[in-house]
Amino acid sequence: MADQHFQQPLHFQGSYGQQQPRSYQVAKAATAVTAGGSLLVLSGLVLAGTVIALTIATPLLVIFSPVLVPALITVALITMGFLTSGGFGVAAVTVLSWIYKYVTGKQPPGADQLDQARHKLAGKARDIKDRAEQFGQQHVPSGQQQSS
């Protein structure tokens, strides 16, 4: 029993613990090599097409660049302006909707946090007012009375 040797399985385990036959492994490898080779050839063709397109387009871009560059800059600025305007519009509608819900008492998300912050701020304002009154009363000379 002590000299019993365990052999390593020659086949990989499948996803459910079943051993896959050698032919299945060969088929998987052949499929992977075929797909990888096809993608490699395709990437080479795309690279060659890009180089050819740049070779043809570069003289045209150089000739028309005094017109194209300002036009592209203008189009880009107009597009960014419209997108920014739309974004600010959506933000404004969202904020106005939230304010409407808050004012009508529908408790939108974050309203309780706003109320807590408002109460804390009001409490601190009262504390500062009280301290200012105490400070003012302490530093008034005894001979002078405040006229109210």
Swiss-Prot record:
Q: Residue positions of the PTM N-acetylalanine?
A: 2
Record's subcellular location:
Lipid droplet; Membrane
Q: What does this protein do?
A: May have a structural role to stabilize the lipid body during desiccation of the seed by preventing coalescence of the oil. Probably interacts with both lipid and phospholipid moieties of lipid bodies. May also provide recognition signals for specific lipase anchorage in lipolysis during seedling growth.
Native source organism of the sequence: Prunus dulcis (Almond)
Q: Gene Ontology terms, cellular component aspect? A: extracellular region; membrane; monolayer-surrounded lipid storage body
Instruction: Indicate yes or no for the key word Transmembrane helix.
Output: yes
Name the family the entry cites: Belongs to the oleosin family.
Q: Which UniProt keywords apply?
A: Acetylation, Lipid droplet, Membrane, Transmembrane, Transmembrane helix
Q: Which residues cross the membrane?
A: 37-57, 81-101
Q: Which residue ranges does the record annotate as region Polar?
A: 2-28
The protein in question is named Oleosin 1
User: Which membrane topology term applies here?
Assistant: Multi-pass membrane protein
Q: Which GO terms describe its biological process?
A: lipid storage; post-embryonic development; reproductive structure development; sexual reproduction
Q: What is the lineage of its organism?
A: Eukaryota, Viridiplantae, Streptophyta, Embryophyta, Tracheophyta
Q: Which InterPro entries match?
A: Oleosin
Which segments does the entry list as coiled coil?
none
Q: Where is this region: Hydrophobic?
A: 29-148
